[in-house]
């Protein structure tokens, strides 16, 4: 029997060919693996079947965060190329970023439209604290997001090894994206078409939360013992409707791991907004959410550990082995799974 605290227990083999480089179109034709908790059965559907699979009494909660063009390409003062990936605002017009290439405190990085990045601090997790200026004037968050729309690139995950295209601007954004701030998509949301959403609204209570997905979502767990992992922090905010649903006895389907973490954060803290650092795993199981819709996640990631918190390690790995053998498409642009 596998040790639930050992990182190697969350590893699995994935052929490179199963990593989706672009989505299935139309969206609802993506495949959907369904796991029935009571019987431990695995069934195979498509996303267009989702509305008929959700338990009748369940409320459905979505994440309406909007992905920004968080990746910018420029040059160091020395002339060498550099790449900056925005992580999140820190307040006081400072931002957490990841920089590809070596930079030190005091470095100034140059980008299009006279945008400059000034490196102020180096963090232990590899991120940098910076501010952004245009024509010498420090940019606030709204101004920065506006400038990034002009010069930035869609922040495709590192395992999608190609340049972003115009298509990614719509592919990597959910149809209900509203509040700008994510630097990665809440990928379970990407499967929804307007028609699918209307079918669900006709049968279920729905609500929205906002959790701005940070670049830390791609950061692997590097500790041998998962309990030593330091979880990244992400800003969240719940609508009044979401708070009402979580505070009720109504069963909840969370669309994606970001919704799950937000639901569980509120169930514990009763704080309607703040920063979520919740690490759900077999030592810290959900206390409120009942059902989960999610994509297939990277080996040894906090996201696959979140899945185990619902159904256990052995069943999770059995599902993943089945998905590989059935040639499901993995990761952000891939297929999904429903735990009910």
Swiss-Prot record:
Keywords: Cytoplasm, Queuosine biosynthesis, S-adenosyl-L-methionine, Transferase
MF-aspect GO terms: S-adenosylmethionine:tRNA ribosyltransferase-isomerase activity
UniProt keyword annotation of S-adenosyl-L-methionine present: yes
Coiled-coil ranges from the UniProt annotation: none
GO cellular component, one term: cytoplasm
Domain of life: Bacteria
Enzyme Commission number(s): 2.4.99.17
Principal subcellular localization: cytoplasm
Catalysed conversion reaction: 7-aminomethyl-7-carbaguanosine(34) in tRNA + S-adenosyl-L-methionine = epoxyqueuosine(34) in tRNA + adenine + L-methionine + 2 H(+)
Presence of the UniProt keyword Chloroplast in the record: no
Enzyme class: transferase
Alphabetical GO biological process terms: queuosine biosynthetic process; tRNA wobble guanine modification
Family, similarity comment: Belongs to the QueA family.
Function: Transfers and isomerizes the ribose moiety from AdoMet to the 7-aminomethyl group of 7-deazaguanine (preQ1-tRNA) to give epoxyqueuosine (oQ-tRNA).
Oligomer and partners: Monomer.
Record protein name field: S-adenosylmethionine:tRNA ribosyltransferase-isomerase
Organism: Campylobacter concisus (strain 13826)
């Amino acid at each position: 029997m596998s040790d639930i605290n050992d990182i190697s227990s969350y590893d699995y083999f994935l052929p490179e060919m199963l990593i989706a480089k672009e989505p299935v179109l139309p969206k609802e034709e993506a495949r959907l693996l369904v796991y029935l908790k009571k019987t431990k059965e695995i069934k195979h559907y498509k996303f267009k079947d989702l509305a008929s699979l959700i338990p009748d009494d369940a409320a459905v909660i979505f994440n309406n965060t909007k992905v920004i063009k968080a990746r910018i390409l420029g040059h160091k003062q020395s002339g060498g190329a550099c790449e900056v990936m925005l992580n999140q605002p820190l307040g006081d017009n400072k931002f957490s970023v990841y920089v590809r290439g070596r930079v030190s405190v005091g470095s100034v990085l140059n980008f299009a439209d006279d945008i400059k990045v000034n490196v102020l601090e180096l963090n232990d997790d590899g991120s940098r604290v910076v501010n952004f200026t245009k024509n010498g004037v420090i940019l606030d968050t709204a101004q920065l997001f506006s400038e990034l729309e002009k010069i930035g690139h869609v922040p495709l995950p590192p395992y999608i090894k190609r340049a972003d295209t115009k298509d990614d601007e719509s592919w990597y954004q959910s149809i209900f994206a509203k509040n700008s701030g994510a630097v990665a998509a809440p990928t379970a949301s990407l499967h929804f078409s307007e028609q699918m959403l209307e079918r669900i609204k006709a049968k279920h209570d729905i609500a929205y939360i906002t959790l701005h997905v940070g670049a830390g979502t791609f950061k692997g767990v590097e500790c041998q013992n998962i309990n030593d992992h330091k979880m990244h922090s992400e800003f969240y905010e719940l609508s009044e409707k979401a708070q009402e649903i979580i505070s009720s006895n109504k069963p909840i389907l969370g669309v994606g791991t970001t919704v799950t973490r937000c639901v569980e954060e509120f169930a514990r803290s009763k704080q309607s907004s703040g920063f979520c650092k919740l690490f759900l795993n077999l030592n810290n199981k959900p206390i409120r959410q009942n059902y989960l819709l999610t994509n297939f996640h990277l080996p040894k990631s906090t996201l696959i550990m979140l899945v185990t918190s619902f159904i256990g390690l052995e069943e999770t790995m059995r599902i993943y082995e089945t998905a590989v053998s059935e040639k499901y498409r993995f990761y952000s642009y891939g297929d999904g799974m429903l735990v009910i």
